[in-house]
Amino acid sequence: MIRVHRIRLDPTATQGVYFARACGVSRFAYNWALAEWKRQYEAGGKPDEAALRKQLNAIKAAEFPWMAEVTKCAPQTAIKNVGLAFEHFFRRVKLGQKPGYPRFKRKGIRDSFRADNGPADATSHAVEVTGKVVKLPRCGVVRMREALRFAGRVKSATVSRMADGWYVALAVETEDRLTAKQDRGAVGVDLGVTTLATFSDGTTEPALKPHRAGHKRIVRLSQSLARKKKGSANRAKAKAKLARLHLRIANVRKDALHKLTTTLATNYSTIGIEDLNVSGMLRNGSLARSIADAGFSEFRRQLEYKAVMTGAQVIVIDRFYPSSKTCSGCGTIHEITLRDRVLSCGCGLKMNRDLNAAINIRRQALALQSVERKALAGASASVKPVSVKQKKRDVHRNVQTA
């Protein structure tokens, strides 16, 4: 299992200059590879990132000698990222989604570079972590604000510049010590903008709305930035101040989501959530800011990877299932609007619509889980017995590559 720990760095002035230079090399290599990919494709060729890496290696000593000032990993991993960007682009095209053609990178926007370690049996590694220091290629030992949390082999280090300084994201290959599956009960979770999460057992998690809380300050700093002369030192200071505020808002949101998803993944074995169409919901002009402030997509991402580590199962309910409109008592479907906060049914049930939806999500998740288990049981029962000789042949064929 690959786990990533992002840690703030305390580089010296010289190391900070090196980081900026390495980010520039990475950005240049990415833009060069993207332009070359487009040129070859328009000429009728079939470009690929491996060929582009070889092409750059052949010409960089003569045409780009300044690349030798930083680790060779910076341009190489940048070109790999171009290949990944096109993989995602073609995947979205096949799925009929908005493709999002890869774009050129600008200076000062998400500056980063990556250094990869070699194979596990290599005698030396480009990236090494000891206590609160990390050794990076061509840079030396850099101090970290905290020690690495995970034990295992460090596969790579991605150094990036945030609004408040430099960070390193360490990817660590750890042992697959997953928590044994236990029956900790099931829960349905309904997400919303007024109340972030409502559990089927009645527990609620209020929405922090960090962006709304800091909106006035964002407006004030944005107006101050607009009044500054372009290229001036005061404009750079105002821009950095605004960026730090945006980073703080994002961190407050992410921290709240981490606490919520950790609670769910550790306290329940079956978690039902809805397959929300977040991109479609963001088209609602009156609710777009509140929906973006809640972080629904980040909630699902965190919950799914944490559930794997705790042995829980996340069951995603179809987005068209009328969880809010269906009475959790008798199953009658009602026509209600977003203004209706209470569901009243002829059967006598009168309940908060979010709690009613969470109960329905839990019930639907358990039903889907039961169907899945029956299907797996039927599939295992239909498997024909295999001879000992056949098993020996299969052992040699099934080589794990993941």
Segments predicted by a language model, with ranges:
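Nucleic-acid substrate recognition interfaces
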Residues: 1-402
